């Protein structure tokens, strides 16, 4: 695919994750941050979260989503800053403009689709917000959206409190939707020559994943079917985490055939009473089955139980911690990497899908405003003009 140019006014995680996926393809990604405000740290607040890696504005939490990107700083509160942005769109032949600020700021900052598309009609514009442009003031924080979209209601023990997922899934889902819909927009542009606007509502994107619960409301479901149930599956029995002599193991029975194979394992033969032969029958005895399963698994090491399940083709997995996940051969050989300015190799998460020709190593994140001067020169600004813009607070870096 042709290398594209993405200019992204981004912060936090949702949009940086989307543009990371473009950077992983070898596209040019320029992250646009604000100029310093009175009394505040400059740029994306995430720059200053976590342990110091090489300097104060490139800390651990900021690194992985922002590798492979350039960084510029423009004051979009000023008309001259907005004019500068529009010039960059043309001079750099920007394909995609992204932002993840609250929609009420679009026109205030001159980044709304109508304004930018008048400057560059073939521009693809993508914005992430909490609930879309109809709710212009709603803040889009992942934990808030997990609560709002019912995810916390569905996560945790049945008799425990609502629980946050261990991964910022709404942020990442929103970023994936930007990635996918930009690709669709590029295909459409190739046919029509026209740009388009993409609005990703984090709430709508999150609700689209409620495919196993939300539709049940029109089928007179029981309350237990649409609330949290710990590690158990609401429909398939037994599917759960069980204790072993040295840890835990997860196993899933998804059919009556798999149940029969389970009860043919000598250790589990005592569970195979006739009423349990069907999933419907097992559902009626689910609490007893979970107790019976745990009574067996707790007597044996995880590796021994896993070997039995593997021989019987029962879906299962140990409960890995994050170091163990990274050490899995299927993951380890696909890890992306970056290098700190002093040459230290840093291993990061793999790409979602292997892409032929994609580089596994991406440049270390740029310092705040590191590329402002170079990008402005590329857009035709002389050094004297750049210095004047800096003195007036229109740019930084």
UniProtKB/Swiss-Prot annotation:
Give the superkingdom in one word. Bacteria
Q: According to its UniProt record, which residues of this chain constitute the active site? A: 171
Q: List the disulfide bonds.
A: none
Matching entries from Gene3D superfamilies are given as: Crotonobetainyl-coa:carnitine coa-transferase, domain 1, formyl-coa transferase, domain 3
Q: Which reaction does it catalyse?
A: phenylsuccinate + succinyl-CoA = 2-phenylsuccinyl-CoA + succinate; phenylsuccinate + succinyl-CoA = 3-phenylsuccinyl-CoA + succinate; (S)-2-benzylsuccinate + succinyl-CoA = (S)-2-benzylsuccinyl-CoA + succinate; (R)-2-benzylsuccinate + succinyl-CoA = (R)-2-benzylsuccinyl-CoA + succinate
Say yes or no: keyword Metal-binding present: no
Pfam families given in the database record: CoA_transf_3 (PF02515)
**What EC number(s) does the entry state?**
2.8.3.28
Do you know which InterPro entries this protein is assigned to?
Answer: CoA-transferase_III_domain, CoA-Trfase_fam_III, CoA-Trfase_III_dom3_sf, CoA-Trfase_III_dom_1_sf
Q: Name one GO molecular function term.
A: CoA-transferase activity
| Key words of the record | Transferase
Respond yes or no to whether keyword Signal is given for this record: no
Its top-level enzyme class, in one word, is transferase
This protein's assembly is summarised as: Homodimer or homotetramer.
Function summary: Involved in degradation of indoleacetate, the most common member of the auxin class of plant hormones. CoA-transferase that catalyzes the succinyl-CoA-dependent activation of phenylsuccinate to phenylsuccinyl-CoA. Acts as a rather unspecific CoA-transferase that shows a broad substrate specificity for C4-dicarboxylic acids, including succinate, (R/S)-phenylsuccinate, (S)- and (R)-benzylsuccinate and their CoA-thioesters, indicating a fully reversible catalytic process.
Similarity remark: Belongs to the CoA-transferase III family.
Question: What is this protein identified as?
Answer: Phenylsuccinyl-CoA transferase
The organism is Aromatoleum aromaticum (strain DSM 19018 / LMG 30748 / EbN1) (Azoarcus sp. (strain EbN1))
